[in-house]
From Swiss-Prot:
Tissue expression summary: Widely expressed with highest levels in colon and ovary. Tends to be silenced in breast, colorectal, gastric and liver cancer tissues.
Subunit structure, interactors included: Interacts with EHMT2/G9A, GFI1 and HDAC1.
GO molecular function: DNA-binding transcription factor activity; DNA-binding transcription factor binding; DNA-binding transcription repressor activity, RNA polymerase II-specific; methyltransferase activity; RNA polymerase II cis-regulatory region sequence-specific DNA binding; RNA polymerase II transcription regulatory region sequence-specific DNA binding; sequence-specific DNA binding; transcription cis-regulatory region binding
Cellular component terms per the entry's GO annotation: nuclear body; nucleolus; nucleoplasm; nucleus
Annotated protein name in UniProt: PR domain zinc finger protein 5
Record carries keyword Repressor: yes
Family label: Belongs to the class V-like SAM-binding methyltransferase superfamily.
Top-level lineage group: Eukaryota
Biological source species: Homo sapiens
Record flagged with keyword Transferase: yes
Subcellular location: Nucleus
Task performed by this protein: Sequence-specific DNA-binding transcription factor. Represses transcription at least in part by recruitment of the histone methyltransferase EHMT2/G9A and histone deacetylases such as HDAC1. Regulates hematopoiesis-associated protein-coding and microRNA (miRNA) genes. May regulate the expression of proteins involved in extracellular matrix development and maintenance, including fibrillar collagens, such as COL4A1 and COL11A1, connective tissue components, such as HAPLN1, and molecules regulating cell migration and adhesion, including EDIL3 and TGFB2.
GO process annotations (BP): cellular response to leukemia inhibitory factor; chromatin organization; methylation; mitotic cell cycle; negative regulation of DNA-templated transcription; negative regulation of transcription by RNA polymerase II; positive regulation of transcription by RNA polymerase II; regulation of extracellular matrix organization
Alphabetically ordered keywords of this record: Activator, Chromatin regulator, Disease variant, DNA-binding, Metal-binding, Methyltransferase, Nucleus, Repeat, Repressor, S-adenosyl-L-methionine, Transcription, Transcription regulation, Transferase, Zinc, Zinc-finger
């Protein structure tokens, strides 16, 4: 299942155009930015029928315009965060359009979108295409536009999915497949209710214009009232059920009478009746009608195939926030499982290597690496793998294909996630501000680490071998490998071993030539972000490291450390031949050349005198021959 992870630059809130959650911008989005790809199950067009909900479906076409398949994101287990982008009520309100690249669907910003704006999808019309040609967005659109398969897209669904939308709304541009759906649309969005038609909450008296809004409110209102009225809850003397409000209790009493001993178990009904015949009549009248009408979500009107699937679907309208990192989940179980990642406890150990884990299932998955059975063999290097996903990731290290390109610096990446992570370096907006100082950050987790390290001096994970402390347990585990010499990660190009995936990843760039970190001032690129940061200081002349003795400043910490030795007289680099000591390692290396009988000598072209170092030769030519080095 694809988790409902939402990138930091977006947030989930109640939609302004439909019931349920919508996707909003957490920062300004520029025209031409692209998001995706859209995730969903692949379905063939012939598997669809006109009773299905098309709002979360996209059609994927081949090079000749033929329909290859339908991407269906109806099931949250097979979708991603783009499922929360709703159809724009009209073309004027859209700020995104769908495009197809290869067999992937992406969402393209067709205008600059301000912060805290709901993202609404539409289709590209001819005016939009002409405007794109003028403003270079066509560099993003390589395979042509994708038509919208959602319910309100009148230009898309008529030709592709065989559903005629003959019932047009007189208030907006929407059209629908039946008069009943049109009537529901008018009542929900356009009709102002009369006093007698308002839907009123029996708990608090609050009124709502539509029934769906009331149903959502009741879930929250009942939970609040249960806390306030827990001391005076209402309990049924027949079945011992408790209720937080008198109205709910009275409604229950009508169905739960002492003389009603026949219980209806259909669809979790629970109604009690006096006789077997009454139960039979009830089931025929209530539970054997048109099943399609009973399996419709009251929030988004999605039609489900069974009561259990409807119950599962309703969970997507409940969003559970992690209070530690603000990630969002669609079920309490997912959130509970995620919270383990924030815990310091690792109670489950592997009895073979004593490695500890936070979850028992992780131990089971880990034990496979100790088994000799490694069914996934790499055909290129012969390396075996116990897990299929690890094998698939390994195969990518042999591939030169990088289909995902950054539009800012043209860097290429193998996966959408790698590209998305890289794009953070181009985002100039830092939305997370430290309350202790003026520092700002692009991600909240980076801000949290800053506060812990700088302001709280909070490094609670300490190495028992060297007493060095770290902010997170993962960094401590990586550090410990420097003591044990453990190097599990092997470079597929040269066989060199590394202690962590991060150092291996940086090393592999020396083989592939990948330099994803581009200098904004010049054309120079770097394989590591630290290298880029230090290089940028050559443009900005920034020297943040100052000597406390003489106020001399340096652009790198290493330069400051070397300079301090001129004040302390410390010379930690000693020659093992003649015991001379030096303050810098490069000075020791240069000195050792004098002990090498086979060393290359620098020769004067005028008098053929030889010198052990080039700088000695330069001084000689300047003083003796009057030739300055150019």
């Amino acid at each position: 299942m694809l988790g409902m992870y939402v990138p930091d630059r977006f947030s989930l809130k109640s939609s302004r155009v439909q019931d349920g959650m919508g996707l909003y911008t957490a920062r300004r989005v520029r025209k031409g930015e692209k998001f995706g790809p859209f995730a969903g199950e692949k379905r063939m067009p012939e598997d669809l029928d006109e009773n299905m909900d098309y709002r979360l479906m996209w059609e994927v076409r081949g090079s000749k315009g033929e329909v290859l398949y339908i991407l269906d994101a109806t099931n949250p287990r097979h979708s991603n965060w783009l499922r929360f982008v709703h159809e724009a009520p009209s073309q004027e309100q859209k700020n995104l359009a769908a495009i197809q690249e290869g067999e992937n669907i992406f969402y393209l910003a067709v205008e600059d979108i301000e912060t805290d704006t709901e993202l609404l999808i539409g289709y590209l019309d001819s005016d939009m295409e002409a405007e794109e040609e003028e403003q270079q967005i066509m560099t993003v659109i390589k395979e042509g536009e994708v038509e919208n398969s959602r319910r309100q897209s009148t230009a898309g669904r008529k030709d592709r999915l065989g559903c005629k939308e003959d019932y047009a709304c007189p208030q907006c541009e929407s059209s629908f497949t039946s008069e009943d759906i049109l009537a529901e649309h008018l009542q929900t969005l356009h009709q102002k209710p009369t006093e007698e038609k308002e839907f009123k909450c029996k708990n608090c008296g609050k009124k709502f214009p539509v029934k769906q809004a009331l149903q959502r409110h009741v879930l929250q209102c009942t939970a609040k009232s249960s806390l306030k009225e827990s001391s005076r809850s209402f309990q049924c003397s027949v079945c011992n059920s408790s209720f937080s409000s008198a109205s709910s209790f009275e409604q229950h009493q009508e169905t739960c009478r002492g003389d009603a001993r026949f219980v209806c178990k259909a669809d979790s009904c629970g109604k009690r009746l006096k006789s077997k015949d009454a139960l039979k009549r009830h089931q025929e009248n209530v539970h054997t009608g048109d099943p399609k009408k009973k399996l419709i979500c009251s929030v988004c009107n999605k039609k489900c195939s069974s009561a259990s699937s409807l119950q599962e679907h309703r969970k997507i309208h409940e969003i559970f926030d992690c209070q530690e990192c603000m990630k969002k989940f669609i079920s309490a179980n997912q959130l509970k499982r995620h919270m383990i990642t924030h815990s310091e406890k690792r109670p489950y150990n592997c009895e073979i290597c004593n490695k500890s884990f936070k979850r028992l299932d992780q131990v089971g998955a880990h034990k496979v690496i100790h088994s000799e059975d490694k069914p996934y063999k790499c055909k290129l290097c012969g390396k075996g793998f116990a897990h299929r996903n690890v094998y698939k990731n390994h195969k990518k290290t042999h591939s030169e294909e990088r289909p995902f390109q950054c539009e800012e610096c043209k860097a290429l990446f193998r996966t959408p996630f790698s590209l998305q992570r890289h794009l953070l370096i181009h985002n100039s907006e830092r939305t997370f501000k430290c309350h202790h100082c003026d520092a700002t950050f692009k991600r909240k987790d980076t801000l949290n680490v800053h506060v812990q390290v700088v302001h709280e001096r909070h490094k609670k994970y300490r190495c028992e071998l060297c007493n060095k402390a770290f902010v997170t347990p993962s960094v401590l585990r990586s550090h410990k490998k420097t003591h044990t010499g453990e190097k599990e990660k092997i470079c597929p190009y040269c066989g060199q071993k590394f202690a962590s995936s991060g150092t291996l990843r940086v090393h592999i760039r020396s083989h592939t030539g990948e330099r994803p970190y581009q200098c904004p001032y010049c054309e120079k690129g770097f394989s590591k972000n630290d290298g880029l940061k230090m290089h940028i200081r050559t443009h900005t002349r920034e020297k943040p490291y100052k000597c406390s003795e003489c106020s001399k400043a340096f652009s790198q910490k290493r330069g400051l450390d070397e300079h301090k030795r001129t004040h302390t007289g410390e010379k930690p680099f000693q020659c093992d031949v003649c015991d001379l000591a030096f303050s810098l390692k490069k000075m020791l290396i240069r000195h050792k050349m004098t002990h090498n009988p086979n060393r290359p000598l620098a020769e004067c072209q005028f008098c053929h005198k030889k010198f052990t170092r080039n700088d000695y030769l330069k001084v000689h030519m300047d003083n003796i021959h009057g030739v300055a080095d150019s």
